[in-house]
Regions:
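Active-site loop-helix segments enriched in His/Asp/Glu that coordinate
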Residues: 1-35, 39-44
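Charged helix-capping and loop-helix junction motifs
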Residues: 10-14, 47-51, 76-83, 153-162
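Acidic (Asp/Glu)-rich catalytic clusters
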Residues: 17-28, 51-59, 82-86, 128-134
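Short, acidic/polar
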Residues: 42-53, 99-106
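Active-site core of metal-dependent hydrolases
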Residues: 62-151
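Short acidic/histidine-rich active-site segments
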Residues: 93-99, 168-183
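Flexible glycine/proline-rich, aromatic-decorated loop/lid segments
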Residues: 155-165, 179-181, 187
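Mid-to-C-terminal alpha-helical segments outside catalytic/metal-binding sites
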Residues: 196-230
Length: 230
């Protein structure tokens, strides 16, 4: 929307980064920008955005993503986009398997995704779960969002425990703060209340989240060093 008002992609990103840096100065946090290509947009528009964002990789931008309607726009149609990202050393995650298709997860892995957004569809695909575990591909779980989009029918059928026991690196996320009206604490507590998440799991999930993040090594080390006192 902002580009339609005359702003350049780099200007938009730099403005967002200014806000994030202001938050970092006030709060004890680290931030990074994940730019997101959209499935419903044409290849030229998405690729142009990635090329502009790549100029700011390491200066606010940490990686890229692909989101949108998986059924209407399957991941197989975005090979060129992620070949470019891979060749230009731009880390990426791909929303995959939020709907019922495991094929989009498989394709994302073939493209070289370091993380999978949601991945719910592989809950009944043990070979795919094993592949994610073996390749240490992080899966971004978003319980509230998955309930709202009906990726699952109830929290009782959420595959957190199944993924955990399969050895898949996972992070617990909000997906979005405002649309779902949730926080990371709320998401953890939803799993606790469902009897899925135990305190003993905390360090493993925390460390898996940190390892799968696109933060640079210095940030990861700084956050890691604080674990014993948190």
């Amino acid at each position: 929307f902002s580009t339609q008002q005359g702003l350049k992609i780099t200007e938009i990103i730099e403005s967002v980064n200014e806000g994030l840096k202001s938050a970092e100065a006030k709060r004890d946090i680290h931030t990074g920008i994940l730019v997101c290509a959209m499935r419903n947009l044409d290849q030229e528009t998405n690729l142009s955005m990635l090329k502009d964002a790549r100029e700011l990789l390491g200066s606010g931008v940490v990686g890229c993503d692909l989101a949108g309607d998986e059924k209407a726009y399957p991941t197989s149609g975005f090979r060129e986009l992620f070949e470019w990202a891979r060749k230009n050393d731009m880390p990426f995650t791909i929303h995959s398997g939020e709907c019922g298709s495991t094929l989009n997860i498989q394709t994302a892995i073939e493209y070289g995704a370091r993380r999978i957004g949601h991945g719910i569809a592989m809950k009944d695909a043990p070979e795919l779960m094993k592949l994610c575990a073996d390749k240490k591909i992080g899966v971004e779980l978003c319980p509230t969002s998955n309930l709202q989009t009906k990726a699952i029918n109830s929290i009782e059928e959420y595959p957190f425990k199944k993924f955990y026991e399969a050895g898949i690196p996972m992070s617990i996320n909000t997906d979005n703060r405002t649309v779902s009206d949730t926080t990371c604490t709320d998401e953890y507590m939803r799993l606790v209340d469902a009897g899925m998440f135990k305190e003993a799991m905390c360090q493993k999930i925390y460390m898996a989240s940190l390892a799968a993040s696109f933060a640079d090594d210095s940030v990861k080390q700084e956050v890691f060093s604080r674990w014993p006192i948190m």
